[in-house]
Regions:
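N-terminal leader/targeting and accessory segments in enzymes
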Residues: 1-104, 364, 392, 397-407
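Phosphate-binding loop of NTP-binding sites
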Residues: 5, 21, 101-234, 240-246, ...
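Acidic, Mg2+-coordinating active-site environments of NTP-dependent enzymes
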Residues: 80, 84-89, 195-342, 366-367, ...
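Residue-level signal for inorganic ion chemistry
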Residues: 51, 70, 105, 120, ...
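Short acidic-hydrophobic, aromatic-tinged amphipathic segments that line or gate anion-handling sites
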Residues: 93-97, 423-432
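Active-site beta-alpha connecting loops in nucleotide-dependent enzymes
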Residues: 58-61, 327-328, 346-421, 470
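ATP-dependent carboxylate/acyl-activation modules
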Residues: 120, 329-331, 453-461
Length: 470
């Protein structure tokens, strides 16, 4: 058979190579000769011989600037938006849109395998829910998951490129900034089940209204097969208004709503974890325990349980497997340093997740409570109200001292002060460290939460170095 030959991705773990016509597998990315590729990378530091390097033009860094170096280091082909100096023309594949090309490659590669896959989206709780899904699915077989929160046009393909013949289950997190992005990702991943955790105000800046956010999250339906379960939070004020396609099976989870298909009752939460009972209309009642604090994490666990059981996995084993959940990064991570309890929740923030995190702090008995809360980004017109409400929630949580960090947090500080909370408003990291040194003492509990761009993770690490060890 003569060319054209398609640029196809085959990791080393794959034991077979399937010939598929170029127009079926990857229209537009054809080469003059057949080739097998062992990796697809977007970071020039990860280039190895036999890989494909995909150039992404970014705001701060343009991947095209690293293409020649990638080729010199052994990249078999370069996917670029234009010819690149230092890379032979016959080793360059020109595409108008790198993201679309990568999505196409990943989509068609994914079709070589048939794992049971859960797709997760929502305004808040995506990554925690994804990790609960991973804990449950891993009890049944080899499971692939999205690493960190790599949930965009680059992260989802990178996850799918890690599929191999031994993968039995997978969970893929899908994020978005604009309408249409979830549809693109779900059509690429083709999950067997979908989860929408909740609809909040994250990305309101780009989408305008919560109703538009709901529409964008519901795009996950377009990649689900007929009869697939779509798992939704019945306690969220907006999700029950969603127009779920009749070809899908809606599965509602919650705590407050008695009509939930999967409901948690008798919830008891503390710093050592949370226990509850799962009442499942289809499979019965089960005891469950999770190593996380806060009622909001029960919702994430319920979503994972509901999705896994509706994929046919044993309900009792699914409930038990929730206990094997492990935190990732600084997400609801409780640690003790220098006699101080720190609730690290620094990766991202929205009004909904702020309120949930403050509820964890509120539940801690017999301790002085300090909240280090920073700016919440991408809230658009809801920003001032969101920060103001957070200040009010801090007061309701019994916060003794609030350190508000960032320009948007001025409204938070003002609201907390008005409700009697001792409050300082910091404009930079050094001011924050100064007040942490001044306020924090052994026996205290400190909640740290803000949008990732505020840099609280590094700030905490710097502060930890100043605390007594052991």
């Amino acid at each position: 058979m003569c060319g054209p030959y398609v640029l196809t991705y085959y990791p080393k773990e794959v034991l077979f190579m399937q010939k598929i016509p170029a127009n079926e597998l990857l229209a537009g990315l054809t080469l003059a000769e057949p080739v097998s590729i062992h990796a697809v990378v977007t970071d020039s530091r990860e280039v190895k011989p036999g890989c494909v390097f995909v150039c992404f033009p970014g705001e701060r860094v343009d991947g095209h600037d690293f293409a020649a170096g990638a080729y010199q280091n052994g990249a078999a082909y370069i996917i670029a938006n234009h010819p690149v100096e230092g890379v032979p023309a016959d080793r360059t594949v020109i595409v108008p849109d790198s993201a679309k090309a990568m999505i196409r490659m990943a989509s068609n590669y994914r079709m070589l395998f048939n794992p049971k896959m859960i797709g997760v989206t929502g305004s808040v709780g995506k990554t925690t829910t994804k990790e609960f899904c991973y804990a449950v699915l891993s009890a049944f077989g080899k499971t692939l998951k999205t690493e960190g929160n790599q949930n965009n046009d680059i992260g989802v393909p990178n996850t799918l490129f890690r599929l191999d013949n031994d993968t039995e289950y997978a969970v893929v997190e899908m994020g978005m900034d604009h309408a249409g992005e979830i549809e693109r990702l779900t059509r690429c991943a083709r999950p067997s089940a979908g989860i929408i955790t909740m609809i909040g105000v994250s990305h309101l800046e780009n989408l305008g209204t919560r109703e538009n956010i709901l529409k964008a999250k519901m795009e996950i339906c377009t990649g689900l097969p007929d009869g697939a379960p779509l798992v939704l939070n019945v306690d969220n004020d907006l999700l029950p208004t969603a127009d779920v396609p009749t070809r899908l099976k809606a599965v509602w989870f919650g705590i407050d709503a008695e009509n939930a298909d999967v409901r948690a009752v008798d919830v008891e939460t503390g710093t050592n974890g949370t226990t509850f009972k799962i009442i499942d209309k289809e499979y019965g009642t089960f005891d469950a325990a999770i190593p996380t604090a806060g009622v909001h994490t029960v919702y994430d666990a319920l979503a994972a349980y509901a999705a896994a059981t509706r994929l046919g996995l044993d309900a009792a084993r699914c409930a038990a497997a929730l206990a094997t959940y492990q935190t990732t990064g600084m997400r609801q991570h409780i640690v003790k340093k220098g006699g101080v309890t720190f609730i690290e929740d620094c990766y991202n923030a929205s009004p909904d997740s702020m309120r949930a995190a403050l509820s964890v702090l509120k539940a801690l008995p017999n301790t002085r409570k300090i909240a280090l809360l920073g700016d919440m980004l991408e809230l658009g017109d809801a920003s001032e109200d969101g920060h103001r409400h957070t200040g009010e929630w801090a007061a309701d949580a019994g916060v003794d001292q609030l350190i508000a960090y960032g320009p948007r947090s001025a409204a938070m500080a003002d609201a907390a002060k008005a409700h009697g909370v001792v409050t300082v408003h910091c404009k930079n990291a050094e001011e924050v460290l100064q007040y942490l040194r001044q306020f924090v003492r052994p026996g205290d509990a400190v909640l740290a939460k803000a949008s990732h761009a505020m840099g609280l993770e590094q700030l905490l690490q710097d502060f930890y170095k100043e605390l007594p060890q052991g």
